[in-house]
From Swiss-Prot:
GO biological process, one term: mitochondrial translation
Protein name: Putative leucine--tRNA ligase, mitochondrial
Motif 'HIGH' region, chain ranges: 67-77
Keyword check for Signal: no
Motif 'KMSKS' region: where in chain: 628-632
Keywords, sorted A to Z: Aminoacyl-tRNA synthetase, ATP-binding, Ligase, Mitochondrion, Nucleotide-binding, Protein biosynthesis, Transit peptide
UniProt keyword Transit peptide, yes or no: yes
Family per record: Belongs to the class-I aminoacyl-tRNA synthetase family.
Cellular component aspect of the GO annotation: mitochondrial matrix; mitochondrion
Enzyme Commission (EC) number: 6.1.1.4
Reactions the enzyme catalyzes: tRNA(Leu) + L-leucine + ATP = L-leucyl-tRNA(Leu) + AMP + diphosphate
Gene Ontology MF terms: aminoacyl-tRNA deacylase activity; ATP binding; leucine-tRNA ligase activity; mRNA binding
Amino acids binding ATP: K631
Organism: Schizosaccharomyces pombe (strain 972 / ATCC 24843)
């Protein structure tokens, strides 16, 4: 009765023995016991693999960002892992070879802080939490490939983080340097630039970051700046907001470095600018706080040093006791420390041209810098281009195009070797040194004779020592362990000391997706065959908060691992993640007083009629709103308690139905009951069908279970076939997973109506129920499996995916096609195989890239060929 994808010789798991295994009654139940159903099926699946094994199918690598083992999964974890589990179940039903692993991002400050506070080892604390969280995933009914499990604090894993560091060192991409670094005074460790927010606070502790001069280890991510920026264009399945954040962070600008000679000094001051033509209107030079000239003068000028230390003065400028010569006009220019100039931009020095830049204008006004209110650019060059002619007023330059003026000035300065064309990047090298214990040891030793020497690969891993307690912050605890520090120089065999800083934990998480594919490999981080056949990750799911840190570092590592021959990802431009899903947050109901918006504990609130008031003061009104969950807001949800109350199936369905994947989920426990009522309705439909079958004679049953060609039966058959097509599209689109449930509710109502009016053939009703149960099985595994068994099947509900007889073309694999606009390929799209040219054009116009490139343009002509879409616009 149910037409399904064939098993192609794959072995379908039999579950006939489950009838004896399950403990509850199979008679009609108006109220199914969801908790009992879930527990029995989860227990059964511990020893019975629920899916069809298909090692020869097309691969589908589905990965959710692995968690820090804090000891407790929160509702945000439940949401992201539910999404990845649903997709993995769907693609397994489609016959794919699915990779759906899980591991632990286990190094980091929380474990070390907990160890200090509780007087225990960081290792014991971490592994105990991993044990707890694995048990919690069981309650959530998430099916991970636990045979691929990794933990970054395991020496078998961090050995390969050290190996990759050494490969970077040998390639000149890992180096040690003196640097002014970001210092977190609370966690007492260095932070990378990416770990300091726009307000100058630490990403983890929230403390105001200080500056220190330390010798630190860096990874030369800047060497990959162009690749990291340009290859964002090849990621059509990444959210635009994430790509925009990475573009801005990399911050490539093309401009010029111009040298300004210092008066009464042989040195020059190098300035970066994208508008060299404004040099004639420059009134001052502005320097960043950590520019070498500012730091040099602060050593000689106590007032300047105090100015830089005093946070209340940092928004004010300070004039240095030196001047620069304008290389075009010859004018002497005052030099200032200016707070709006960033260390990370260009050379940390900019030209101050108040009539061309608002920030320059405001700074000049605050610091009483004299400048002309109108442009006096009238200077231009002789035909020989060697000397400056007389000054003219600006009207004489009105006919000179800006580009021509820029070219004249640049040519003049280049001839005098005072200017050069450069690309500037906001992205700086990645500082990875951390003054903490619980991290990957940096595999270097320091020798008085040889300097910094790499540990031989044969001696990896450099293991962390066993410590029962960690006592100190501020300097690496490893620096206090003399027996661990003392070693022999691998080069001269003389006495040496180990590097006592550990690596930023983002190093470990920048390549873990490779290790999942070959987690038992003792020779390499990942075998070339495994990486090249199973990478990239097809669907990567995690929070948008990782847009810059983790995702940028992972792209860097992925490209580097290709460069050292660990994978062949040229086809994908060595990008690790094909599709990125940034799921929305979960917000909880928050109670605040109307008068002063004080956050309340729900226990302080009472409901009177339709309004809420303080229990302690019934006249004080309370307002309700949904806000980000946190302990301080008393609006969190214990996912395990909730699952134990309602059952994992109901919670999974509620999470998916309540909001689109990228939308904010407003957690409302009252709405969970609606999901429960829907599943109960399916349960009753199944039992009504079974009851009707039970009353039939054998001959009647044989006839009635055959789908017949009458109007009502054909209508229901058309509805369930359309439902298959819709579900397939929703699962593969991912962002519309919530519509699987809403469409399933509609089909449930149609089936219930068919059972009531008694005008639909019972065989058609059974087929529609089988389709319904199969299509919701990725979301609602235990309940669907139970219904499938009740419908008389002894194979797994996951044995195959049904095919729609209405629109078989919808089940075909989508194709990736480049879109060319006015002769240039602008983007690529993944789309279903469509034959009608208008449908194809409409599909292109509805994509994000289509809207970006075509929203304000009229398509004059379109040419659709087999492998390219070509558009001509006005």
């Amino acid at each position: 009765m149910l037409k399904s994808v064939g098993t192609n010789g794959r072995k379908v798991p039999k579950i006939a023995s489950l009838c004896n295994f399950l403990k509850f009654n199979k008679n009609i139940h108006s109220n199914p016991d969801f908790l009992a159903i879930a527990e029995n099926w989860k227990s059964y699946w511990k020893s019975h693999y629920p899916f069809v094994k298909n090692d020869k199918g097309k691969k589908k690598y589905i990965l959710s960002m692995f968690p820090y083992p804090s000891g407790l999964l929160h509702i945000g974890h439940v949401r992201v892992y539910t999404i990845s589990d649903i997709l993995s179940r769907y693609y397994r039903m489609k016959g794919y070879k699915v990779i759906h692993p899980m591991g632990w991002d286990a190094f980091g400050l929380p474990a070390e802080n907990a160890a200090i506070e509780n007087g225990i080892s960081a290792s014991s604390w971490t592994y105990e939490n991993i044990k707890k969280m694995k048990e919690q995933t069981y309650h959530m009914n998430i099916y991970f490939d636990w045979d691929r499990e990794i933990s970054t604090c395991n020496p078998d894993y961090y050995k390969w983080s050290q190996y990759l560091f050494l490969q970077m060192f040998h390639k000149g991409l890992a180096y040690q340097a003196e640097a002014t670094v970001n210092w977190d005074p609370v966690d007492c460790t260095v932070l990378a630039n990416e770990q300091v927010d726009s307000h100058g606070r630490s990403w983890r502790s929230g403390a105001i970051v200080e500056k220190k001069n330390l010798r630190q280890w860096f990874l030369k991510i800047s060497d990959y700046s162009d690749q990291l920026l340009d290859d964002l264009e090849t990621l059509p399945k990444w959210p635009d907001k994430v790509k925009k954040m990475q573009r801005n962070w990399i911050g490539r600008t093309t401009g010029f470095e111009i040298s300004f000679p210092l008066l009464n000094d042989k040195e020059t001051l190098t300035v970066f600018t994208t508008k060299p033509e404004t040099i004639i209107d420059v009134s001052f030079i502005a320097l960043s706080k950590n520019h070498k000239l500012v730091l040099l003068e602060s050593q000689k000028d106590p007032s300047l040093a105090e100015h830089l230390r005093n946070e209340s003065l940092l928004d004010k400028g300070y004039q240095l006791p030196c001047f620069a010569k304008n290389p075009v006009t010859g004018k002497a220019l005052p030099i200032f420390y200016a707070p709006y100039v960033l260390d990370c931009y260009g050379t940390g020095a900019v030209m101050g041209a108040p009539i061309h830049d608002r920030r320059d204008f405001e700074f000049a006004k605050r610091n009483n810098i004299i400048f002309s209110k109108e442009s006096c650019i009238g200077s231009y060059f002789t035909n020989e281009g060697k000397e400056l002619l007389n000054h003219h007023d600006s009207s004489n330059l009105m006919d000179i195009k800006q580009k021509m003026l820029q070219q004249k000035i640049v040519s003049y300065l280049e001839e005098k070797k005072l200017a050069k064309r450069v690309k500037n990047y906001r992205l700086k090298d990645w500082l990875i040194s951390r003054q903490r214990f619980w991290g990957t040891p940096i595999p270097m030793v320091h020798c008085e004779t040889c300097g910094a020497v790499p540990v031989p690969e044969s001696e990896l891993p450099v293991k962390l020592p066993d410590l029962d307690k960690i006592y100190e912050k501020g300097t690496s605890p490893l620096s206090n362990l003399e027996t661990w520090m003392k070693t022999t120089c691998p080069k001269c065999h003389g006495p040496a000391t180990r590097e006592t800083d550990t690596m930023d934990t983002f190093v470990d998480s920048s390549w873990y997706y490779f290790r999942f594919l070959d987690s038992k490999n003792s020779e390499l981080p990942v075998g070339l065959a495994s990486a090249s056949s199973l990478m990239p990750v097809d669907i990567y799911i995690g929070g948008v908060e990782h847009s810059i840190l983790h995702l940028l570092y992972s792209r860097f590592f992925s490209k580097f691992m290709k460069d050292i021959g660990l994978w062949n990802g040229d086809k994908y431009l060595n990008e690790p993640f094909t599709q990125l899903i940034t799921q929305g947050m979960v917000h909880g109901l928050t109670y605040t007083t109307m008068s002063d918006e004080r956050i309340l504990n729900p226990k302080e609130v009472q409901k009177i009629g339709d309004e809420y008031f303080l229990i302690s003061n019934p006249k004080e009104k309370v307002q309700l709103s949904y806000q980000k969950m946190s302990k301080s807001k008393h609006n969190g949800v214990d996912p395990i308690r909730t699952i134990q109350k309602y059952g994992s199936d109901i919670i999974r369905a509620y999470i998916i139905f309540s909001a689109p994947v990228e939308g904010v989920l407003l957690w409302n426990e009252n709405a969970i009951m609606g999901t429960k009522r829907w599943l109960t309705k399916i349960w009753n439909c199944v039992h009504q069908l079974l009851e009707r079958e039970k009353k039939m004679s054998d001959a009647m049953r044989q006839t009635k279970l055959t789908i017949v060609d009458d109007h009502n039966s054909r209508k229901l058959e058309s509805q369930y076939n359309e439902f298959i097509s819709q579900c397939s599209a929703h699962y593969e689109n991912v962002f519309s997973l919530n519509l699987v449930i809403s469409d399933a509710m509609k089909l449930t109502n149609n089936i219930a109506d068919a059972l009531k009016n008694n005008k639909v053939n019972i065989g058609t009703i059974k087929a529609s129920l089988e389709v319904l149960v199969k299509c919701i099985a990725p979301i609602i595994p235990c309940f669907s499996s139970e219904c499938w068994l009740l419908l008389g099947h002894n194979s797994s509900v996951y044995s195959n995916w049904p095919i729609s007889k209405n629109k078989k073309e919808n089940m075909e694999e989508p194709v990736t096609i480049p879109v060319q606009i006015n002769g240039k390929v602008r983007f690529k799209i993944e789309m279903p195989k469509l034959n009608d040219e208008n449908e194809i054009l409409n599909f292109v116009l509805e994509t994000n890239d289509g809207k970006r490139w075509l929203s304000n343009k009229k398509v004059l002509k379109s040419f659709v060929k087999q492998k390219i879409i070509s558009l001509v616009t006005d």
